Design a protein with these regions (language model features):
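Sec/Tat signal peptide C-region and signal peptidase I cleavage site
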Residues: 17-23
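Immediate post-signal peptide segment of exported/extracytoplasmic ligand-binding proteins
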Residues: 26-62, 154-165
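An extracytoplasmic/periplasmic, membrane-proximal ligand-sensing/linker region
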Residues: 36-38, 200, 217-231, 236, ...
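Pocket-flanking alpha-helical
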Residues: 76-80, 91-132, 200-204, 220-227
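Bacterial N-terminal signal peptides
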Residues: 7-17
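Pocket-lining segment of extracytoplasmic ligand-binding domains
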Residues: 118-119, 128, 186-288
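Bilobed "Venus flytrap"/periplasmic-binding protein-like clamshell domains
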Residues: 59-82, 90, 145-203, 207
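Ligand-binding clefts/hinges and TM-proximal coupling segments of bilobed small-molecule sensing domains
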Residues: 171-183, 252-326
Length: 390
């Protein structure tokens, strides 16, 4: 075929194609004959490009832990439930864990809040001799991290670890190990060389190179539950709720249903649990970031009941807006919200209820409690009762 003919044909084809394209983008497409449907008009409205100041004003970030654990899931849940387009947006950030999260909250400009365990300040006192709580404020307790210790069955309780070598990954186990063993005056040798690698650290115990492995994490932990414990050589070690631990931890337990490979059928193992707190830097009240977090707190507290329902993480049922954490000061907007709720609900529902609660506490030998302490306890009781009904 001659070149000029090819060019002519190509031009004709292009003309036909363009004619079809123009027809397809005409303002109105008429319906087929015999129908009564209205003509379709293509949408021509364009979106306004976001304003950078508005985007930043409504965005807060939360640093968590490696993907897959409860900490990262909790932040993702908050991002989904509380999203309000330009008004409020939560950016979850995968972090290393509670110890590094403190450093990131203090020094990373892009981090507004983070998840920190209640025993982390104790770790900083031991390691650095400094109190970090005067530079931080907690918003609320989110859930509990149970302390897991796996060791050979001849080690029955935590006290049997005297003089032993402990695998304690830095950001998931070392901080709890230091706090617990220091409080209980148990001398051990720590190996934290695996940092965040809790699987590699556990393998050291499986291979007989270490005597025990410790991590603080929400049960049920897949690594522990899926451990192939041939001959049931390993088990979960008991941690009694010793008085020396009670300002840092809550009592908890593991069951054979949770860890059938590490606990004999029908038995339970005592342990302790550290609260996981949502923590913010102690900003001045007039600071822009203080105001941003304050707006987030109002949204979170106002919708807290939504988190206790599926498909959210089941550990949300342990969340407590009003829990008082020893050694910590609460973020003022969070405390203000609780105080307002207290004024609206405590005596409004039943004017005699607080007085009756005070009588009950007196009968139980707690007559020395101040009015403020009574009101906080009563507030916690009401919240617990409300959650139990849900």
């Amino acid at each position: 075929m001659r070149p000029l003919v090819c060019i002519a044909l190509a031009g004709a084809i292009a003309g036909l194609w363009l004619h079809g394209a123009v027809a397809q983008t005409s303002p109105a497409v008429q319906p087929p004959s015999g129908t009564s449907e209205p003509a379709f008009t293509p949408l021509t409205t364009r979106w306004a490009f976001p304003n950078s100041d508005a985007v930043n004003a409504g965005t807060v970030s939360i640093i968590t832990a490696p993907a897959g654990g409860a900490k990262s899931v909790f932040a993702a849940d908050m991002a989904r439930v509380l999203d309000e387009k330009d008004k409020l947006r939560i950016l979850p950030i995968l972090g290393k864990g509670p110890v590094q999260n403190v450093i990131d909250i203090l020094y990373l400009k892009s981090v507004d809040m983070g998840l920190v365990a209640t025993d982390v300040p104790e770790f900083y006192k031991i390691q650095y001799g400094s109190d970090i709580t005067n530079r931080l404020r907690y918003i609320m307790k989110l859930y509990n991290d149970e302390i897991h210790i796996i060791a050979p069955t001849e080690i029955k309780t935590v006290f049997d670890l005297e003089g032993k070598r402990i695998e304690a990954p830095k950001d998931v186990g070392l901080y709890s190990a230091k706090a617990i063993f220091s409080r209980l005056k148990i001398n051990v040798t720590y190996d934290s060389s695996h940092l965040n690698d809790d699987t590699g650290a556990l393998q050291e115990v499986i291979d007989g190179k270490a005597d025990a492995w410790i991590v603080g994490t929400a049960k049920v932990m897949p690594i522990a539950r899926n451990l192939k414990n041939e001959g049931r050589r390993l088990h979960l070690v008991s941690i009694p709720y010793d008085q020396r631990l009670q300002d840092l931890y809550l009592p908890s337990e593991f069951t054979s249903d949770e860890y059938p490979n590490l606990i004999p059928p029908g038995e339970k193992v005592d342990t302790v649990a550290a609260g996981i707190l949502l923590v913010v830097f102690n900003w001045p009240e007039k600071h822009e970031r203080y105001q941003k977090v304050a707006r987030f707190v109002d949204a979170l507290f106002s919708r807290i009941d939504e988190f206790a329902k599926p498909p959210r993480h089941p550990k949300w049922k342990e969340a407590s807006v009003s829990a008082v954490i020893p050694g910590w000061q609460r973020f003022k907007p969070a405390q203000d919200w609780i105080d307002r709720w207290h004024e609206q609900h405590l005596d409004a529902a039943n004017p005699t209820s607080l007085a009756r609660f005070k009588d009950f506490m007196t009968q139980q030998g707690h007559a020395s409690l101040s009015q403020e302490e009574l009101e906080k306890l009563y507030s916690q009781f009401l919240e617990w009762n409300r959650r139990a009904k849900n």
